[in-house]
Amino acid sequence: MADLPQKVSNLSINNKENGGGGGKSSYVPPHLRSRGKPSFERSTPKQEDKVTGGDFFRRAGRQTGNNGGFFGFSKERNGGTSANYNRGGSSNYKSSGNRWVNGKHIPGPKNAKLEAELFGVHDDPDYHSSGIKFDNYDNIPVDASGKDVPEPILDFSSPPLDELLMENIKLASFTKPTPVQKYSIPIVTKGRDLMACAQTGSGKTGGFLFPLFTELFRSGPSPVPEKAQSFYSRKGYPSALVLAPTRELATQIFEEARKFTYRSWVRPCVVYGGAPIGNQMREVDRGCDLLVATPGRLNDLLERGKVSLANIKYLVLDEADRMLDMGFEPQIRHIVEECDMPSVENRQTLMFSATFPVDIQHLARDFLDNYIFLSVGRVGSTSENITQRILYVDDMDKKSALLDLLSAEHKGLTLIFVETKRMADQLTDFLIMQNFKATAIHGDRTQAERERALSAFKANVADILVATAVAARGLDIPNVTHVINYDLPSDIDDYVHRIGRTGRAGNTGVATSFFNSNNQNIVKGLMEILNEANQEVPTFLSDLSRQNSRGGRTRGGGGFFNSRNNGSRDYRKHGGNGSFGSTRPRNTGTSNWGSIGGGFRNDNEKNGYGNSNASWW
């Protein structure tokens, strides 16, 4: 990949006569120079057959007769749960022998079929955990601040972890804890609140699931109030609640929870918008000990009286900064402060994210009590495991440049980011017509379509995924080797999170971005990120930076950038109001992000988060 920019330049991708922006072109992409015609010709569909973006699956599904699309998926998840989740283990614990009897946890019997479903086949070359390079984590710096910080653990052991959980961790082939897990496990098992900042792919999900399950396995279920035991007043009484900004992230956390609750009494459930609420309510009715939810859907269930938070022992906010940035603060405050959830003194609260700017830390004081602040690695920065390449490509030449890039280097899974839903559909159709196996996810897709697309991408059936910002945060897609920013974001932190989809779990990856004159607002941010990750800075970017500096241009990059260097520091040590023991009056009203410092604006219309029909509700 070292000579990739030279390869691209030799292919004359910036020649406007090559038709990069559409229209009739004599340009022959490299990947077609040695190929025949496409294996199928795309005819103009009838009006009733027209579909948008990623119709590769639907067209092929009509050809093969599978209602589930090209991949033959015969069943939809119906709100994140399917028949697969009721075949034993964590989802059907009563019939699998795993139970809580007389204050003792009795694990259920082993189930080979379920183990293969949850953990994969260990000798499979595509087995998920086999590619994790744990040794690459050893030199990552960690800073923990607060009163009486517990000593970190060095390996997975019992204690502090539960023995059954240890068996499940071994089944998942996790050999040693990541830096965030080394600190979070003893912190949580000691009963402390936690705010943890760690870069993407650092094991944040295990950082809260492992200690949480350890405590649940040992303490057992909380009693259900007598008045709630009649059939007509049935509702879920979870012991732990995990809030996530998007349904993709919620589903991902749920899938991990299924693994580590295998053979235990704990039954996880997931609820999110964009799926039938009736199916989700029935799943909660069957028993819910750990609830993973998006804020909007959880509020809906609370209003319907289908969920009570009275038994919550553990509250987790994952990707907390993104939830607040997306405008979920009123919903989160309603859930935490205005429903029947125990007070901050009577529960444990954990907040995990890749960035925590100072103003978000101030807000977090309302949800945390005497917490420990944990900063792992260079928070808000990119990993040196990711090779970053910035190419200058005009808008009209992007399609040609993309074909050249995919032809020059297309091994493994490629994730392509665009700014709009329309472009996601158009680019996916374009790639399909060029004989690439591509699919797309964005907010206008149905839940079934998005799950099929993600499943196909993870299984390497479709090796190119075109995505909008909905997939930029939190998704753990294994084995992504190349991230392409077809459209660069206007916010430099979005750039960081996008390219963080590769180079995860200690592995290496490549991130290529198409830059042009429309992206000058993030020049300074790109320069700093490239320099701090020891990456090569293109000459054109250095020239633009000097020009902007002389011209006095605004170079903040939007969003959190102006406080990037503060995002990994505990404001209690480095200034700001308050100290380790300080409290402040709770703000129970709704807030307007425009009145809070730190660069927050009403940018929802630009990134798709302002749509009332947004998919994460």
Curated annotation (Swiss-Prot):
Q: Where is the Helicase C-terminal domain?
A: 385-545
Gene transcribed to yield this protein: DBP1
Q: Where in the cell is it found?
A: Cytoplasm
Principal subcellular localization: cytoplasm
Q: What is this protein called?
A: ATP-dependent RNA helicase DBP1
The record's function comment reads:
ATP-binding RNA helicase involved in translation initiation. Remodels RNA in response to ADP and ATP concentrations by facilitating disruption, but also formation of RNA duplexes. Redundant to DED1, may be required in conditions in which DED1 expression is decreased.
Which of this chain's residues are annotated to bind ATP?
A: 198-205
Q: What is the lineage of its organism?
A: Eukaryota, Fungi, Dikarya, Ascomycota, Saccharomycotina
The sequence motif named Q motif is recorded at 154-182
